[in-house]
Amino acid sequence: MLHSQVPGSVLAVFAHPDDTESACGGTLARWAGAGAEITVVICCSGDKGSSDAKAKPAALIRRRAKEAAAAMGTLGLPTPVNLGHPDGSIDESLRRQIRGEVVELIRQRRAEVVLCPDPTAVLFGRHYVNHRDHRDVGWAALDAAAHEAGLPHYWPDRGAPHQASELWLAGTLEPDTWVDISDSLETKARALMCHESQLEEPGEWLRRMVERRAESDGKAAGVQYAEGFRRILLG
């Protein structure tokens, strides 16, 4: 189904500093341009996101935070909320903590739509295994949105209950909803190029990769370029 409605308030919860743009940057840029209030939450600091053995984690955290802020500005969004948890550290205790943090943000922002990674998506063909942080953050956000933020006895110290209407899972193997990003594809590509620490040679190859992925989703939706999601109705 091609989805054209624009929600009033959106909370996008992802693991690493560049995940949001990759998963749904075109959709968020389109929604922001139409007046949606959007908060992006980055759960992990990006402290391990480098193949350079000499890179210092503290410097990497600072650099990636600046890159994320620049990318959000490119999409027309405010500076993201950085929870600052170390990469690869999400055990059961920390996942519970993230649930509470997401519940509080859902309640504060009165989010209508919560966007997060699909935690059930693990193997993408023969060449990509979904990062564990993506899956762990997806489960935490899913549980917070579906079961906890709307009930008063969950996290009673984290604000008044609020039930989001919809949960959108990005990076999914089972898309059933698409957003036309034909007018925001270039914006998405420019946002991803802000993450220079993650790119060996920023340039045309990244734009082509973004275009190919969006073109594939676009064929499923009957438009030139799209992003696909698994949409769960909660309200």
Named regions from a protein language model:
Residues M1-R109, R230:
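Active-site rim/loop-helix segments in enzyme catalytic domains that contact anionic ligands
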Residues M1-L11, E92-G235:
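Metal-dependent de-N-acetylase/amidase catalytic core
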